[in-house]
Amino acid sequence: MNNDPVVTPAGLIATVGGLGKIVKKAPGTAGSVAACVLAVFLPEPVRLAAIAALAALGVWAAGAYEKACGRSDPGEVIIDEVVGQLIATIGHAAVVGQGGGAVNFLIPSFLLFRFFDILKPWPVNACEKAPGGLGIMLDDVAGGVLANLALWGLRKVFIEGWWPF
Protein backbone atom coordinates (compact mmCIF):
# COMPACT_ATOMS: atom_id res chain seq x y z
CA MET A 1 0.00 0.00 0.00
CA ASN A 2 1.27 3.47 -0.92
CA ASN A 3 1.33 5.88 2.03
CA ASP A 4 2.42 8.86 -0.07
CA PRO A 5 -0.05 11.69 0.71
CA VAL A 6 0.34 13.00 -2.86
CA VAL A 7 -1.71 10.09 -4.24
CA THR A 8 -4.80 11.06 -2.24
CA PRO A 9 -7.44 13.47 -3.59
CA ALA A 10 -6.24 16.11 -1.12
CA GLY A 11 -2.63 15.51 -2.13
CA LEU A 12 -3.36 15.81 -5.82
CA ILE A 13 -5.17 19.11 -5.26
CA ALA A 14 -2.60 20.49 -2.80
CA THR A 15 0.35 19.66 -5.05
CA VAL A 16 -1.51 20.59 -8.27
CA GLY A 17 -1.49 17.11 -9.72
CA GLY A 18 1.91 16.32 -8.22
CA LEU A 19 3.66 19.30 -9.86
CA GLY A 20 4.80 20.58 -6.47
CA LYS A 21 6.43 17.23 -5.76
CA ILE A 22 7.99 16.84 -9.23
CA VAL A 23 9.62 20.28 -9.27
CA LYS A 24 12.21 20.01 -6.49
CA LYS A 25 13.73 23.49 -6.79
CA ALA A 26 11.30 26.40 -6.48
CA PRO A 27 8.00 24.48 -6.55
CA GLY A 28 6.15 27.68 -5.62
CA THR A 29 7.51 29.38 -8.72
CA ALA A 30 6.29 26.41 -10.78
CA GLY A 31 2.82 26.89 -9.27
CA SER A 32 2.90 30.58 -10.19
CA VAL A 33 3.94 29.77 -13.76
CA ALA A 34 1.09 27.24 -14.02
CA ALA A 35 -1.34 29.93 -12.85
CA CYS A 36 -0.01 32.39 -15.45
CA VAL A 37 -0.60 29.82 -18.18
CA LEU A 38 -4.17 29.37 -16.91
CA ALA A 39 -4.70 33.13 -16.77
CA VAL A 40 -3.86 33.51 -20.45
CA PHE A 41 -6.58 31.07 -21.47
CA LEU A 42 -9.31 31.72 -18.89
CA PRO A 43 -11.64 34.70 -19.30
CA GLU A 44 -11.77 36.84 -16.18
CA PRO A 45 -15.18 35.61 -14.93
CA VAL A 46 -13.91 32.03 -15.16
CA ARG A 47 -10.70 33.04 -13.36
CA LEU A 48 -12.75 34.58 -10.56
CA ALA A 49 -14.79 31.39 -10.21
CA ALA A 50 -11.60 29.32 -10.32
CA ILE A 51 -10.07 31.45 -7.54
CA ALA A 52 -13.10 30.93 -5.31
CA ALA A 53 -13.28 27.19 -5.97
CA LEU A 54 -9.54 26.57 -5.71
CA ALA A 55 -9.24 28.65 -2.54
CA ALA A 56 -11.98 26.65 -0.82
CA LEU A 57 -10.60 23.33 -2.04
CA GLY A 58 -7.09 24.50 -1.21
CA VAL A 59 -7.86 25.19 2.45
CA TRP A 60 -9.17 21.64 2.81
CA ALA A 61 -6.51 19.95 0.66
CA ALA A 62 -3.53 21.84 2.08
CA GLY A 63 -4.67 21.17 5.64
CA ALA A 64 -5.25 17.48 4.96
CA TYR A 65 -1.90 17.14 3.19
CA GLU A 66 -0.06 18.99 5.97
CA LYS A 67 -1.61 16.65 8.53
CA ALA A 68 -0.89 13.51 6.46
CA CYS A 69 2.78 14.30 5.92
CA GLY A 70 3.35 15.68 9.43
CA ARG A 71 5.11 18.85 8.27
CA SER A 72 4.01 22.45 8.65
CA ASP A 73 3.35 24.25 5.33
CA PRO A 74 5.09 21.67 3.10
CA GLY A 75 6.91 23.22 0.14
CA GLU A 76 5.31 20.85 -2.35
CA VAL A 77 1.88 22.29 -1.55
CA ILE A 78 1.50 24.82 -4.36
CA ILE A 79 -2.27 25.24 -4.72
CA ASP A 80 -1.78 28.38 -2.62
CA GLU A 81 0.63 29.84 -5.18
CA VAL A 82 -1.81 29.07 -7.99
CA VAL A 83 -4.60 30.94 -6.18
CA GLY A 84 -2.38 33.86 -5.17
CA GLN A 85 -0.98 34.26 -8.67
CA LEU A 86 -4.45 34.12 -10.22
CA ILE A 87 -5.53 36.89 -7.83
CA ALA A 88 -2.55 38.96 -8.97
CA THR A 89 -3.79 38.76 -12.58
CA ILE A 90 -7.37 39.92 -12.02
CA GLY A 91 -8.03 43.05 -14.02
CA HIS A 92 -4.66 42.87 -15.76
CA ALA A 93 -4.10 39.81 -17.89
CA ALA A 94 -5.94 39.79 -21.18
CA VAL A 95 -7.09 36.45 -22.54
CA VAL A 96 -5.53 35.18 -25.76
CA GLY A 97 -7.74 36.25 -28.64
CA GLN A 98 -9.40 39.09 -26.71
CA GLY A 99 -6.87 41.83 -27.32
CA GLY A 100 -3.29 42.43 -26.29
CA GLY A 101 -1.85 42.84 -22.86
CA ALA A 102 -1.52 39.26 -21.67
CA VAL A 103 2.26 39.17 -21.64
CA ASN A 104 2.55 42.85 -20.77
CA PHE A 105 0.80 42.33 -17.44
CA LEU A 106 1.44 38.66 -16.71
CA ILE A 107 5.17 39.12 -16.31
CA PRO A 108 4.91 42.02 -13.83
CA SER A 109 2.07 40.27 -11.96
CA PHE A 110 4.27 37.16 -11.72
CA LEU A 111 7.29 39.13 -10.49
CA LEU A 112 5.26 41.13 -7.99
CA PHE A 113 3.48 38.06 -6.64
CA ARG A 114 6.76 36.16 -6.22
CA PHE A 115 8.22 39.24 -4.48
CA PHE A 116 5.40 39.38 -1.93
CA ASP A 117 5.26 35.59 -1.55
CA ILE A 118 8.99 35.25 -0.86
CA LEU A 119 9.55 38.36 1.30
CA LYS A 120 6.22 38.04 3.14
CA PRO A 121 5.80 41.63 4.35
CA TRP A 122 2.91 42.53 6.64
CA PRO A 123 0.04 41.52 6.30
CA VAL A 124 1.27 38.46 4.39
CA ASN A 125 3.39 37.22 7.29
CA ALA A 126 0.52 37.70 9.73
CA CYS A 127 -1.80 35.61 7.55
CA GLU A 128 0.49 32.59 7.51
CA LYS A 129 0.08 32.31 11.29
CA ALA A 130 -3.48 31.06 10.85
CA PRO A 131 -3.68 27.32 11.57
CA GLY A 132 -3.59 24.48 9.04
CA GLY A 133 -4.79 24.86 5.49
CA LEU A 134 -6.20 28.32 6.17
CA GLY A 135 -2.74 29.67 7.02
CA ILE A 136 -1.17 27.92 4.04
CA MET A 137 -3.69 29.53 1.68
CA LEU A 138 -4.23 32.91 3.33
CA ASP A 139 -0.69 34.25 3.06
CA ASP A 140 -0.69 33.67 -0.70
CA VAL A 141 -4.13 35.23 -1.05
CA ALA A 142 -2.76 38.31 0.75
CA GLY A 143 0.36 38.24 -1.45
CA GLY A 144 -1.83 38.07 -4.55
CA VAL A 145 -3.92 41.02 -3.39
CA LEU A 146 -0.80 43.09 -2.66
CA ALA A 147 0.72 42.18 -6.04
CA ASN A 148 -2.51 43.14 -7.78
CA LEU A 149 -2.70 46.49 -5.98
CA ALA A 150 0.97 47.20 -6.67
CA LEU A 151 0.47 46.45 -10.36
CA TRP A 152 -2.56 48.76 -10.47
CA GLY A 153 -0.44 51.50 -8.94
CA LEU A 154 2.40 50.94 -11.40
CA ARG A 155 -0.04 50.97 -14.31
CA LYS A 156 -1.59 54.23 -13.13
CA VAL A 157 1.76 55.98 -12.73
CA PHE A 158 3.82 54.61 -15.62
CA ILE A 159 1.26 53.69 -18.28
CA GLU A 160 -1.70 55.96 -17.73
CA GLY A 161 0.43 58.90 -16.58
CA TRP A 162 -1.57 59.41 -13.41
CA TRP A 163 0.32 61.05 -10.58
CA PRO A 164 -1.53 62.15 -7.45
CA PHE A 165 0.75 65.11 -6.64
Name the predicted role of every residue range.
Residues M1-R71, G75, V82-F165:
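Hydrophobic alpha-helical transmembrane segments
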